[in-house]
UniProtKB/Swiss-Prot annotation:
Miscellaneous notes: Present with 217 molecules/cell in log phase SD medium.
Species of the source: Saccharomyces cerevisiae (strain ATCC 204508 / S288c)
Lineage: Eukaryota, Fungi, Dikarya, Ascomycota, Saccharomycotina
Official protein name in the record: SWI/SNF chromatin-remodeling complex subunit SNF5
Location of the region described as Disordered in the Swiss-Prot/TrEMBL record: 50-119, 270-299, 664-698, 847-905
Endpoints of the signal sequence: none
C-alpha cells in the first residue's frame, strides 16, 4: 500500500523523505523544516492535514477488516463444554456463518504485527447489551459468581467467553480513543503553529507601520517647529516696528504740546521769574529732552486685533485623525493651560463642599464631615444617658425589692427558660463544686492529631436492668478506638453525673459500665475494606437492609433503607445528619441513627470475617448471609415497586406513656430471652474445620473474639453475631428541661405564674453602747474631786500624805505630791511591771495604777484633813504604751462638799 499522495515524484528527495510517513500515527507537522513551513500557504497546510487524516482512517479500517478475516473458527479439541440452551444456537450460527480465513497480506505496516486469534462473537441479551461496556463486565462477573455458586460449568464457560469478547471491545475503544486523541493533538499543533505564524506576521506589520508612522510624526514636528520659529520671528519684527512708530508719535505729540504752551505764555505776558524753570544742560552740552510730562505715565500696551469669528448653524463634518496622539502632541498655549487649571480648581472645590455637607457614602451616613462628627457624638451621649438611667432605675428597684426589668434586657423567654424579666441573678446550670475542672493539654492533643491516621468508631450499647444490675440505664454511643486522650473511667463518671446519679451509686456502678465498654471494644471487628487498603471506585454492591427502631422520649422513629457495606466512602454520621435535617428531628436522633447503622454493618463485617470471606468481590458461600444480601440492580429494577414504598418511608410516631411502658416491658422480655438463650445465632456455634480455620485471617484481616465468650465455648467453635435480630434503641431520658424528650426536673414549663409578694420587716433595735472600763476626764477646778490611789505595802506614800496637812500651802495644791514622790512612785511601778505614761507637772494630779484593792482618799478644798475611804475593787485596765497625755482618775463633787463621795468610772 502506497501511503504517499500523488505528485510526489516531482518533489525533491528531501521533501519526499519528510512526507514518507504521512498517514501513520508517527506523522507530525512539527517535523517539516522551518524554511519549507514558512514557504507553504495556509491552504497547502490544510490540504496536507486533510490528506493525512484520510490515509490514517483508511489504514485503521483495513486493520479492523484484517483482524475480522484472520480470526479462525474454534477447534474441536480446544472447544469449551457446551453452554446453556439459550447460548448454544447463537454460538452455532456464528460458527457456521464465519468464512474461511483469507491469506494474511504481506504489505501490512510493520508496527501492526500479528493479530491474535479471537473466538466467535456471542450475542448478549438486550438488557445487558444496552449497558456500557464497564457495566456489562460487572454484570457478567456477578452472573459468573452466581453460576459458580450453583455449580453450573457450562454457563460459567459461556459467560467467560462473553467477558473476553467485552474485554476486546473495551480494548478496541481504547485504541480508537488514543488514535482520536493523537489526531486532535496534531490538529491543535497545526492550529497553534498557524496562529503563531499569523501573530508573527501581524507583529511585523505593526512594527513597520509604527516605524513609518513615527517617521511621519517626526517630519511633521520638524515642519511645525520651523513654521513656529518663522512665525515668532515675524511677530517680533512687527512688534519692534510698532514700538518705533509709537515712540515717534509720542515725541511728535510732546513737541506739539510744548509749542502750544509757549504760545499761550507769550499771549498772556511774560512769565514771572519765580515760576521760570532753568534749563538743565547735559554733560555733553546739548539740551536734554523734556522728561517731566512722561514721569507719571505707564507704557501703553500694543493693541491686539481680535480674530474674526464665524457662526456655523450645523455640526462640522467629522474627519479622521492622522494618528491617535494628534491633539496631545500639540503644545498647549498659556490660555488653555490657565483655563484648565481654573476648571480643575473649581471642580475640586465643588467636591470638597459636597463632602463637607453630605460626607462619604461608603463609610457612614454623613462621611467625615462636621455633621457626621457631631451626630455621632450626640448618638453616643444619648446611648450612655439612656443606659445610665436604665441601670440606676434597675439598681434602685432591686434595692427596694421591687421586681424590675433586668439590665441586660428580656433575655430568652422560650422553651424551658421560664421568665427572665425579674431581678438580675446568675444561676449556673451545674454546681461548680460537683464537677472536676478539665484542663486540656494542648501538647497531647497535638500529638494525638499527628499520630492518628484514621478513626475507628466502635458502636457501644449500654443496657442495664434494675433486677439484674441493681440500676437502670440504657444508652448508645460511638467510641473512637484510636483515641488516647480521654479515659473510659472519666467519661463514665461524667455521663453518670449527667444522669444525676448520687455519689454513692455512681462510685458503685462505674466499674460495671467501664467493663461493658471495654468488652465491646475488644470484640470490635474493624472495617476490612479499609484495612485491606484496596484502591477501588465504589464497592462490590454488597447491599443490606438497615432497619431503624429508635425511641427517644415519647417519639418513635421507624424506617428502613438499603446500605452498601463494601463501600468505605459511606458515612453514617453524614447520612444521619442529613436525614434529621430533612425530618426536622432533634440532635438525639442523629447519634442514635448513626449508632444503629454502624452496629448493623459491624454485625455483617464480623460474620463474613469469621466465615473466612476474602472481601474481594467473590461470591458468599454462607446461605443465610447470601439470602439477606439484596440482588443486583438492573434497568428493570431501578424503580422500587409501589407496594414497598410504605415500608421504605420514615414514620415518626407520638406514643403515649402507656405505650411507652408496654414497649419498655417488651424490651425487657426480649433481653431476658436472649440472656437465657446465650445470644446464640441462627445456627448456634460454628465449627472451625481445617479449611475454614486457615481462612479466618487471610489478607491481613485479624478477627478478634471476646475473651469471656471464647472461654465458655467448646474447642473448635466460635460465636457468630445474630444478624436476624435487629436491636431496638431506647434512650434513657436525660433529666433536663432544655433538651427535647428530657425529664422535667421541677414543675412543668407552662406552669409558671408571676406573683408579687411584699413583706415588711421591722428594723432591729440598735445595740446599747458598752462603756469602757476606764475613762480619761479633764480636771475642772470646783467641779471635780481628785482621788489619790495608794498602793498597799508602800510606806512612803502614807508618810507623804501624813505630812501634807503640815504644809504651808493651802487648797488643792497643798495636797499635791512633790515631784520627788512621783519619781519614787514611778520607780516602784516600774519594778512591779506596770507601765505608766509620763505626766507633766502643771497638769498631772495623780497616776493610775493596777492595784487589786485600791483605796480612795478624798481631798477637801479649804485645808480639810484627808481621810482614807475604802472602795470596792475596780476593773483593771490593760497596760497602755507610754505617751505625753494626761491619765488621771477623777470624781465629780457637788459644790465642793465633802459628804458627796460619788465615783464616776
Amino acid at each position: 500500500m502506497n501511503n504517499q499522495p500523488q505528485g510526489t515524484n516531482s518533489v525533491p528527495n528531501s521533501i519526499g523523505n519528510i512526507f514518507s510517513n504521512i498517514g501513520t500515527p508517527s506523522f507530525n507537522m512539527a517535523q517539516i523544516p522551518q524554511q519549507l513551513y514558512q514557504s507553504l500557504t495556509p491552504q497547502q497546510l490544510q490540504m496536507i492535514q486533510q490528506r493525512h487524516q484520510q490515509l490514517l482512517r483508511s489504514r485503521l479500517q483495513q486493520q479492523q477488516q484484517q483482524q475480522q478475516q484472520t480470526s479462525p473458527p474454534p477447534q474441536t479439541h480446544q472447544s469449551p463444554p457446551p453452554p446453556p440452551q439459550q447460548s448454544q444456537p447463537i454460538a452455532n450460527q456464528s460458527a457456521t456463518s464465519t468464512p474461511p480465513p483469507p491469506p494474511a497480506p504481506h504489505n501490512l505496516h510493520p508496527q501492526i504485527g500479528q493479530v491474535p486469534l479471537a473466538p466467535a462473537p456471542i450475542n448478549l441479551p438486550p438488557q445487558i447489551a444496552q449497558l456500557p461496556l464497564a457495566t456489562q463486565q460487572q454484570v457478567l462477573n456477578k452472573l459468573r459468581q452466581q453460576a459458580i455458586a450453583k455449580n453450573n460449568p457450562q454457563v460459567v464457560n459461556a459467560i467467560t467467553v462473553a467477558q473476553q469478547q467485552v474485554q476486546r471491545q473495551i480494548e478496541q475503544q481504547k485504541g480508537q480513543q488514543t488514535a482520536q486523541t493523537q489526531l486532535e493533538q496534531q490538529r491543535q499543533l497545526l492550529v497553534q503553529q498557524q496562529q503563531q505564524q499569523q501573530l508573527r506576521n501581524q507583529i511585523q506589520r505593526q512594527q513597520q507601520q509604527q516605524f513609518r508612522h513615527h517617521v511621519q510624526i517626526q517630519q511633521q514636528q520638524q515642519k511645525q517647529q520651523q513654521q513656529q520659529q518663522q512665525h515668532q520671528q515675524q511677530q517680533q519684527q512687527q512688534q519692534q516696528q510698532q514700538q518705533q512708530q509709537q515712540q515717534q508719535q509720542q515725541q511728535q505729540q510732546q513737541q506739539q504740546q510744548q509749542q502750544q504752551q509757549q504760545q499761550q505764555q507769550q499771549q498772556q505776558g511774560q512769565i514771572p521769574q519765580s515760576q521760570q524753570v532753568p534749563q538743565v544742560r547735559s554733560m555733553s552740552g546739548q539740551p536734554p529732552t523734556n522728561v517731566q510730562p512722561t514721569i507719571g505715565q505707564l507704557p501703553q500696551l500694543p493693541k491686539l486685533n481680535l480674530p474674526k469669528y464665524q457662526t456655523i448653524q450645523y455640526d462640522p463634518p467629522e474627519t479622521k485623525l492622522p494618528y491617535p496622539t494628534y491633539w496631545s502632541d500639540k503644545k498647549a498655549d498659556t490660555d488653555t493651560l490657565l483655563y484648565e487649571q481654573i476648571i480643575q480648581r473649581d471642580k475640586i472645590n465643588k467636591y470638597s463642599l459636597i463632602r463637607e455637607t453630605n460626607g462619604y457614602d461608603p463609610f457612614s451616613i454623613y462621611g467625615f464631615s462636621n455633621k457626621e462628627y457631631i451626630s455621632r457624638l450626640w448618638h453616643t451621649l444619648k446611648y450612655y444617658q439612656d443606659l445610665k438611667n436604665t441601670r440606676m432605675k434597675s439598681i434602685t428597684s432591686t434595692s427596694q425589692k421591687i421586681p424590675s426589668a433586668s439590665i441586660w434586657g428580656n433575655g430568652y423567654s422560650g422553651y424551658g427558660n421560664g421568665i427572665t424579666n425579674t431581678t438580675t441573678r446568675v444561676i449556673p446550670q451545674v454546681e461548680v463544686g460537683n464537677r472536676k475542672h478539665y484542663l486540656e493539654d494542648k501538647l497531647k492533643v497535638y500529638k494525638q492529631a499527628m499520630n492518628e491516621t484514621s478513626e475507628q468508631l466502635v458502636p457501644i450499647r449500654l443496657e442495664f436492668d434494675q433486677d439484674r444490675d441493681r440500676f437502670f440505664l440504657r444508652d448508645t454511643l460511638l467510641w473512637n478506638k484510636n483515641d488516647k486522650l480521654i479515659k473510659i473511667e472519666d467519661f463514665v463518671d461524667d455521663m453518670l453525673r449527667d444522669y444525676r446519679f448520687e455519689d454513692a451509686t455512681r462510685e458503685q456502678h462505674i466499674d460495671t459500665i467501664c467493663q461493658s465498654i471495654q468488652e465491646q471494644i475488644q470484640e470490635f471487628q474493624g472495617n476490612p475494606y479499609i484495612e485491606l487498603n484496596q484502591d477501588r471506585l465504589g464497592g462490590d454492591d454488597l447491599r443490606i437492609r438497615i432497619k431503624l427502631d429508635i425511641v427517644v422520649g415519647q417519639n418513635q422513629l421507624i424506617d428502613q433503607f438499603e446500605w452498601d457495606i463494601s463501600n468505605s466512602d459511606n458515612c453514617p454520621e453524614e447520612f444521619a445528619e442529613s436525614m434529621c435535617q430533612e425530618l426536622e428531628l432533634p440532635g438525639e436522633f442523629v447519634t442514635a441513627i448513626a449508632h444503629s447503622i454502624r452496629e448493623q454493618v459491624h454485625m455483617y463485617h464480623k460474620s463474613l470475617a469469621l466465615l473466612g470471606y476474602n472481601f474481594d468481590g467473590s461470591a458468599i458461600e454462607d446461605d443465610d448471609i447470601r439470602s439477606r444480601m439484596l440482588p443486583t440492580i438492573t434497568l428493570d429494577d431501578v424503580y422500587r415497586p409501589a407496594a414497598e414504598s410504605k415500608i421504605f418511608t420514615p414514620n415518626l410516631l407520638q406514643i403515649s406513656a402507656a405505650e411507652l411502658e408496654r414497649l419498655d416491658k417488651d424490651k425487657d422480655r426480649d433481653t431476658r430471652r436472649k440472656r437465657r438463650q446465650g445470644r446464640s445465632n441462627r445456627r448456634g456455634m460454628l465449627a472451625l474445620s481445617g479449611t475454614s480455620a486457615s481462612n479466618t485471617s487471610m489478607n491481613g484481616v485479624h478477627n478478634t473474639v471476646a475473651a469471656g465468650n471464647a472461654s465458655s465455648l467448646p474447642p473448635g467453635e466460635i460465636l457468630l453475631p445474630d444478624i436476624a435480630d435487629i436491636p431496638r434503641t431506647f434512650r434513657t431520658p436525660v433529666p433536663s428541661t432544655l433538651m427535647p424528650g428530657g425529664v422535667d426536673v421541677g414543675p412543668s414549663v407552662e406552669s409558671y405564674e408571676l406573683r408579687n409578694t411584699t413583706t415588711y420587716k421591722s428594723r432591729p433595735d440598735r445595740p446599747k453602747p458598752v462603756s469602757p472600763p476606764c475613762y480619761i476626764i479633764d480636771h475642772i477646778p470646783g467641779h471635780s474631786l481628785l482621788l489619790s490611789i495608794k498602793l498597799p505595802g508602800k510606806v512612803n506614800t502614807k508618810e507623804e500624805f501624813a505630812a501634807a496637812p503640815n504644809d504651808t500651802s493651802s487648797g488643792t495644791n497643798a495636797m499635791l505630791p512633790s515631784p520627788e514622790s512621783l519619781k519614787t512612785k514611778l520607780n516602784s511601778n516600774i519594778r512591779a511591771g506596770v507601765t505608766i505614761p509620763s505626766i507633766p507637772n502643771p497638769i498631772a494630779n495623780h497616776t493610775v495604777t493596777n492595784s487589786p484593792n485600791p483605796t480612795l482618799q478624798p481631798v477637801i478644798p479649804g485645808g480639810a484633813a484627808s481621810k482614807s475611804v475604802p472602795t470596792p475593787s475596780l476593773p483593771i485596765a490593760p497596760p497602755v504604751a507610754p505617751h505625753d497625755s494626761e491619765a488621771t482618775l477623777l470624781t465629780n463633787s457637788n459644790n465642793g462638799s465633802s459628804n458627796n463621795n460619788t465615783q464616776n468610772t
